[in-house]
Amino acid sequence: MTRVIGLLSFWDESPTWLAATLASMARVCDHAVVLDGRYALYPDQRLQSGSHEHYAVIDAARASGMGITLHTAPHTYTDEMSKRTKLFQLGLCEAETHTDWFFILDGDEVLVECPPKQQVVDALDAYREDGVGVVSATLWEKADPHQSELRTETNMKLATDWRYECSTPRFWLSHANMRVVGYHYNYVGEDELGTTVELWGHDSACVNRAKWASECGSVIIENRNRLRGIQRDKDRQQYYADRDACEMETVKPLEEYDA
């Protein structure tokens, strides 16, 4: 029987948000694999999130009747690619390759709308039989209009819509050797013949690209990234600035990464 396995990567997140993320995952997932850890360039000295965050993850999963695997270790991750690759490695320990699906959320996201679990699984089964390897969901991102003085002033003067909506890939058929190469949204894996397949990325010339489907019912994810506190937002922006200054992420043809 097909299983949907949730994958969650986080660092120093609100326990309330984490509990909401895990509880919402249980609406479509049988098991969740959670990875805690800081990027090396992130402006903080701690290596692991607080134990209260770990308890929130475990308790929310257990209360929701969902299996849970939590991995936390006292070291940093070089970059986003290495951490996400580790998450895929952990997920593949739980998944039946080329049969089960991964559903990915971040610690600042919550699944707010979706069909009943069996309906989602049936849709994913049908997609897999049709050769589909990636299925999208709808993402809502809403900013807090009063997070800063500038936003408050803008909100008072202009009729600004603070919600952004887009389609984003979130369900991934589990492939052997799933990993992230080059840049943080370049996912690759191996099909049943051992051929490297691009699951998500920029290489439009790649001949081995996974087949995508635009939706899986009305699955809607709310992203709360812009609702964080001012200091956390500053730390995030500092990390991205340092990451880009170091040129840690590169875009090039897929075959060059594996050369």
Annotate each language-model stretch with its function.
Residues 3-5:
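Cell-envelope/extracellular polymer assembly enzymes that use nucleotide-activated donors
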Residues 7-9:
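Short hydrophobic beta-strand elements that form part
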Residues 13-28, 34-36, 45:
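Short, well-formed alpha-helical segments that are part of the catalytic scaffolds
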Residues 29, 97-99, 129-132:
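Short, high-confidence coil segments that cap the C-terminus of an alpha-helix
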Residues 37-100:
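Active-site-proximal specificity loops/subdomain of glycosyltransferases
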Residues 78-88, 109-259:
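Catalytic-site signature of metal-activated, phosphate-bearing donor transferases
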Residues 96-112:
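Short beta-strand-to-loop acidic/aromatic patch adjacent to the donor-nucleotide binding site
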